[in-house]
Amino acid sequence: MEKRTTIYDIAARLGVSTATVNRALTGKPRVKEETRRLVLQTAEEMGFRPNSLARSLARRRLRFAAVGFTSFPEFHNDFLRGVKDAGAELADFNISVDCLGFDRGPSDTPEAEAFLDGTLRDIADGGYDGVLVLGRMVDAFRYLAEKKVCAATVVNDIEDRSLRRFTICSRGRIAGRMAAELIYRMLPDRGRSVAIASGYEGMPAHRETELGFLEQTERTPLDIAEVAYNHDNAEIAYASTARILREHADLGGVYVNSFNYTGVIRAVRESGRAGEVLIIASDICEELKELIREGTVVASIFQNQYEQGRLGLHRMYEALADDAPVEDVICIDPQIVMYSNITLY
């Protein structure tokens, strides 16, 4: 069966937003006449049948939710911002979007898990059609499936993939390889040991970066002192890093494969070895930018959770509104952020 052309295909062909294509096709303002002409010409060439907009007005409003659940609001708020921007881009297509974020401290407590489970159950009972979840596996995913709410995971996947429609994530295996090679190339004495400050043992997002790091050490050999699981808790990360520094006087580098960098930095600074121990972090924020500028962190592997959120809502809309096929796993390429290119982020 031939794939029907959508406004997403036209937008991709022309390198413009779906909102621009929509305004051009519907005769709305705020579109240059040359752009409107080009959109209409391309739509005709691609065999576009302008029925998607009409269907969106005829059907009931589609309701979407997004949940950001980590110990670090600064991290998951970027994901939610991407979802909100996608909602604005789809504003003419009869949808609504509600964004919910966790801001009650560490996410590794029973109270935090109850928040995530309860929030997803409320969404299942709240008449929503789809939900994007940046979090981890809880029983409520089964309840969402029972209620026939389309669920998708972002940044981190869940173990039972039958409970979600698709996942969007960074290429974690590659991110881990990049981190290992960076440390190998930058380490003055390659005989010194390195550690991985990870999140949860077995959690897909953390497991993939760990595996990538370890795989790369087969090509660029590094002595792994320890993989520490810090449960996305800054205090646990501080304690484990301080212990590793005491036990491994030769420690030359640390790869932090989650946003949980503050405890690691504090321990390294208190040991008097800031700038001596190479630190590769993950993602980016204003504080991390400053740490890179001052040399405490040499680089960070950025997974662009904003774009994961924005793309996630678009893909979910396509799946529910247009019954379009969606890849099971949608990957975002990781990027290296260093002093030399930090102004781009």
Where are these regions (language model features)?
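Amphipathic helical "hinge" segments at domain boundaries
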Residues: R49-A114
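Short beta-strand elements in bilobed, periplasmic/extracellular small-molecule ligand-binding domains
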Residues: G87-L116, S193-I196, L214-E235
